[in-house]
């Protein structure tokens, strides 16, 4: 069972074989690409405490961890993880690692283990777009 090279670069502790990668089609965003993407977000968006960000295929959290790090330049950690970041991840082991890396409980309603193509995206609270899906 060979460990996937990309997994070694992602900082994940989950053992991912080449067979698993082939079966699940998991692709992880390398840290340098995460940094580039996060640095492309306009500063006024990062500074706005009402900004929200979702990763609908979060994996083990590379993008959200990088984004959280950047947001901590402007906001406290509690506000970021409870008001600004959201994630959906289908693989239970990835979801668990995502939550550990973000420092939240695995049952936190912003970070769900579900199929992003079927999830209702309410995250437990009405968000005002439900009227468009009836």
State where each predicted segment sits.
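SAM-dependent methyltransferase catalytic region
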Residues: 1-134
């Amino acid at each position: 069972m060979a460990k996937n090279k990309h997994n070694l670069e992602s900082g994940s502790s989950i053992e991912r074989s080449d067979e698993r990668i082939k079966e699940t089609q998991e692709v992880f965003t390398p840290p340098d690409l995460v940094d580039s993407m996060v640095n492309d977000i306009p500063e006024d968006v990062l500074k706005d405490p009402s900004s929200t960000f979702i990763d609908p295929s979060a994996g083990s959290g590379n993008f959200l961890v990088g984004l959280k790090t950047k947001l901590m330049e402007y906001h406290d950690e509690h506000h970021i993880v409870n008001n600004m970041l959201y994630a959906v991840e289908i693989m239970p082991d990835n979801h668990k690692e995502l939550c550990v890396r973000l420092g939240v409980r695995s049952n936190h309603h912003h970070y769900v283990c579900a199929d992003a193509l079927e999830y209702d995206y309410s995250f437990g609270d009405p968000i005002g777009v439900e009227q468009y899906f009836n």
